[in-house]
A protein has these predicted regions:
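N-terminal cap/leader regions of alpha/beta-hydrolase-fold enzymes
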Residues: 1-239
Length: 239
């Protein structure tokens, strides 16, 4: 069985103390790295579990803290307030995400020239925004992410983009899916959208229904299929 190391990484953004989690295979090798951007609830065992799965597939992973160390384990209403705060200034959010990319690239266990990002729900929007920033990143994957554009001057998208979407997600209606497709086409980037029928928001989270939000529920088949496609995507990026 592959050894797995897990370490907290302290960093800052505009004076805010953040604490991301680096999950690696325990060796001294610099491997392709995947930044995992969590849901509105911030860094949890769910994302750390996803990171451990990535290590098993030959990647090291940084579970990104974008909300701040003081919000770890905070109540749902508090976290939704923080999500709204960050989402209200997409230019600042972009800079926050670019700072996380810099942190990831600064880890000796991650090959700074081979980095991808993936995100869930609000984190999916963040992953897309990282691509939209024109960052020098290999690819991004959005899982049940939000597609609304940032309203910032467009940059040349260097990353390959894949979005895994539940067709019945009430937060992302079909016109938003079409709008993302048009946006990515106009940006001339390499993009994919995978839509899963009978699937809502939060479909990768076995505890999604605990949020008690209409249209938010776990779908095992979509979770399995999307992660299988993710690994094909990462293999295409990094070989």
């Amino acid at each position: 069985m592959k050894s797995i190391d897990q370490n907290n990484i302290a960093h800052e953004f505009n004076g805010e103390s953040l604490e991301s989690v680096l999950v690696t295979d325990g060796s001294d090798r610099a491997l392709p790295g995947v930044i995992i951007i969590p849901t509105v609830m911030g860094v949890t065992d769910l994302e750390i579990g996803f990171a451990r799965e990535l290590v098993g597939h030959g990647y090291n992973a940084l579970v990104a803290d974008i909300f701040g160390k003081t919000f770890r384990g905070a109540p749902r209403d508090t976290m939704f307030g923080e999500m709204n705060r960050l989402g209200s200034d997409r230019a600042s959010l972009r800079e926050r995400l670019l700072s996380v990319l810099e942190v990831a690239g600064g880890q000796s266990e991650i090959d700074s020239g081979r980095i991808a990002a993936m995100g869930f729900c609000f984190g999916g929007k963040c992953a897309l925004d990282l691509a939209r920033s024109g960052a020098d990143i290999a690819g991004v994957a959005s899982f049940h992410g939000l597609f609304d554009p940032p309203g910032l001057p467009p940059e040349k998208i260097k990353a390959k983009v894949v979005a895994f979407h539940g067709w019945d997600d009430p937060m992302v209606p079909p016109d938003a899916v079409e709008a993302l497709a048009r946006e990515m086409t106009e940006a001339e980037c390499d993009w994919q959208i995978h839509a899963y029928g009978h699937t809502g928001h939060g479909f990768t989270n076995p505890k999604a229904a605990d949020l008690q939000i209409d249209g938010v529920f776990y779908t095992q088949a979509a979770a399995r299929r999307s992660f299988a496609s993710l690994y094909l995507f990462l293999d295409e990026l990094f070989g």
